């Protein structure tokens, strides 16, 4: 399942990579022909005639899966491409009745720049954090660009400001595990700028903070610190990017902490998208109303 808003440029690569897999696209009020393109590529399309946000789109996708008897679904971003065999590995990891969700290793791709190297370090730390969670707790955070879950394990996601955090918490509360599958990978667009990294991290931390029982490894200081050290040991060339990555992450956390105390920010986060340019355009449109 793919929740898409103006993704006509990136969607074809993903649909081609998915091949004959059953694909559901929720077109969330796109104006660039995303829905038509998805239908032409053979996907099932649900259409919102106005933009309703990621949570509403994901809820429609979950309802469709339940109504049509899908026991396990994979949710992914429109700008992502799964590694060969990774979807199959995700599905296989869900065979145990004790498992309600599963996530993969995320690898950003893009032009080698300052923002790319910082981004690459941040995502490698997340992967190491999930590995540590599996060792210490036998379960891990679900969130990411691509993950699988059993729809029956999830209560309504409508109104949530961070959908994958919401799913992860739902699965945990219902007594299921979320597993990390490190040999399954997904490639996705790296952050386009320092501002884009800040937006992404700020949104993620906001989502973690509004859920007191967040499962995110970044909210466990011991795991986060150990994950950073493991990531640097895995690839020492990441060391020059450690300080800017840590400072950027701390600033993102402080911004999110402030946002979490502002009720009017919740509506803005509900409509948030991960593409920096789209958020800039949306903010500009709101300021001119």
How would you label these PLM feature ranges?
Residues 6-20:
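Short, well-formed alpha-helical segments that are part of the catalytic scaffolds
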Residues 9-13, 32-40:
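Acidic helix N-cap motif at the loop->helix transition within catalytic regions
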Residues 17, 27-35, 50, 80-81:
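A conserved acidic beta->alpha catalytic loop
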Residues 35-64:
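Conserved donor nucleotide-binding strand/loop of the catalytic core
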Residues 56-57, 93-149, 153, 202-205:
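Long helical/loop segments within the catalytic core of UDP-sugar-dependent glycosyltransferases
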Residues 70-79:
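Short beta-strand-to-loop acidic/aromatic patch adjacent to the donor-nucleotide binding site
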Residues 94, 103, 107-122, 158-222:
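Catalytic donor/gating beta->alpha subdomain of glycosyltransferases that bind UDP-sugars
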Residues 206-289:
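Terminal low-complexity segments of carbohydrate-biosynthetic enzymes
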